[in-house]
């Protein structure tokens, strides 16, 4: 049975303005990386979901390990700009052919479960949605 809902987690940024050797999504907070916090949040709130991560070459091995640990789709490399990373994520899930796709910037982890549920409800009504 194919999954109708796929989440693309954009975790490919290098955080130029952040000025740190570690990518923002790999910063640890309360024993979990920002990426892990996103994975845990979405798996908890959306039970039937496949998650596709898009990352950069420097974090690829770490993200691959996280994907194995959390039973996610294999990560893909992103582009040098966000829209290219979205494109590569969409290419990666094209073989799954999901009915719904959510795209989330991993470094914006404070989205609420209520917003996610509204987005899914609206998308089922064929309303295209964006949450800032």
Pin down the residues of each PLM region:
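Short, glycine/charged-enriched secondary-structure capping and boundary segments
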Residues: 22-25, 66-69, 90-91, 115-119
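Conserved N-terminal catalytic core of the sugar/cofactor nucleotidyltransferase
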Residues: 35-98
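Catalytic tyrosine of NAD(P)H-dependent dehydrogenase/reductases that use a Tyr as the general acid/base
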Residues: 24-28, 78, 101
